[in-house]
Amino acid sequence: MNKLVSLAKRRGFIFPSSEIYGGLSSCFDYGPLGSEMKKNIKDLWWNAMTRRHQNIVGIDASIMMNPTVWEASGHVASFNDPMIDDKTTKRRYRADHLIENHIEKLHRDGKEAEAAAIKVAYEAAGGTEDPNRTLYNIIIEAGIKAPDTGSADWTEVRQFNLMFQCNMGAVADSAGVVYLRPETAQGIFVNFHNVREASRMKVPFGIAQIGKAFRNEIVKGNFIFRMVEFEQMEMQYFVKPGTQLEAFEAWREERFRWYSETLGMSKEKLHWYKHDKLAHYADLAYDIKFEFPFGIEEIEGIHSRTDFDLSQHQKYSGKSMEYIDQTTNERYIPYVVETSSGCDRTFLALLSDAYQEDVVDGEPRVMLKLAPKVAPVKAAVLPLMKKGEMGEKAAQLCRDLSESFMVQYDDAASIGKRYRRQDEIGTPFCFTVDHDTLENGTITVRYRDTAAQERINMSKAAEFLATKLM
């Protein structure tokens, strides 16, 4: 993980935020390459969700909304995490995550009976008189230890609200309290009828959104995996009650394919996790998890949210959230199937999956084996000599390609060092302008993954890239 963090900063993917002032815990800035790659991820998601589905449209809701939205959604009253501290290091952990990870480890170790017993107690915790105490007892009785130190000296479990509260207006009083949204989903739900009417949508249909969310995470860390400011890519799919399971399975399959096929993630590093303990709004939930260097963690949640959200907003706003089927005249509040992907977590998963070290021509190299669609730079143009006609042709090729693709021009250092630089940032192709270019108009294409080379006509470079990026 340290190598990945070092590469990310050195090559301009991710910087610590406000670093000259010492930074701020779990806040990061995306650099030139990071912002390009993140945009590629978001564009690929947006195209997959909206362009390829005629019944899904987009929205960009406000970060701050009427605070009653968050009362209706349940966030004001219950958007809490159960936290427990390691007395040895004073580090704080989510109690539920410690238990869930312990159960998964027992399964992997073949200790099914022990895992089942802890799971039964864990699932019953929410219905006990003191859920916090119950979680604490499970941790103590199961001998669960702190992942970092192996210590089992724990504090009691306590609840922490995760919403950022701020004030709107000149006076800091309760009347001006607003919240930075902890999720993007509610901006979709409150616009259900606006979008449906404006877009003339009929159930089933979906609303997609990419946007920032904010959570006062007590447990931070693992680079950009868990931050207080992060970006979500969410889609809420509205269906007729009784059809949600069919829609859920369809989206579950499609979302897994997006990671493995569109983004090119290693299938063997992707895992399904079914939630047996469900959130108050859900009747079914799965996570897509990825094998990070620090463990197997969630990158996307797929949830059947029932009619909870629309019903709550109907109750608190006094406005009907019912849908009238024009064919059957049925009236109902739609059920919702949600796909919720973390853009930053996806970014980190892609970097983790792509990072490789190997030897080429007797020289060690670091390579990011990113899918060409995801790579921040699609091609590098490298003149063998930077002066004279060779440099001029290379510069012209770079200008031509830049009209359609993100391309870098590099004429500094030996050609071998330039290849290594491009390998390290994940550039899939290098176009080398050399002596043969001046004689017959061909250039060398060098492939990142294999270091193999071939020659193509310089006039075909744009066509070559377009084909490889399809």
Curated annotation (Swiss-Prot):
GO molecular function per UniProt: ATP binding; glycine-tRNA ligase activity; protein dimerization activity
InterPro entries: aa-tRNA-synt_IIb, aa-tRNA-synth_II, aa-tRNA-synth_II/BPL/LPL, Anticodon-bd, Anticodon-bd_dom_sf, Gly-tRNA_synthase/POLG2, Gly_tRNA_ligase_bac, GlyRS-like_core
A GO CC term assigned to this protein in UniProt: cytoplasm
Annotated residues for binding of ATP: 215-217, 225-230, 298-299, 342-345
The EC number(s) this enzyme carries: 6.1.1.14
Enzyme class: ligase
This protein's UniProt keywords: Aminoacyl-tRNA synthetase, ATP-binding, Cytoplasm, Ligase, Nucleotide-binding, Protein biosynthesis
Record localization: Cytoplasm
GO biological process, one term: glycyl-tRNA aminoacylation
Catalytic activity: tRNA(Gly) + glycine + ATP = glycyl-tRNA(Gly) + AMP + diphosphate
Coiled coil: none
Chain positions recorded as substrate binding sites: 94, 183, 230-234, 338-342
Family note: Belongs to the class-II aminoacyl-tRNA synthetase family.
Function in brief: Catalyzes the attachment of glycine to tRNA(Gly).
Assembly behavior: Homodimer.
Protein known as: Glycine--tRNA ligase
Annotated organism of origin: Chlorobaculum tepidum (strain ATCC 49652 / DSM 12025 / NBRC 103806 / TLS)
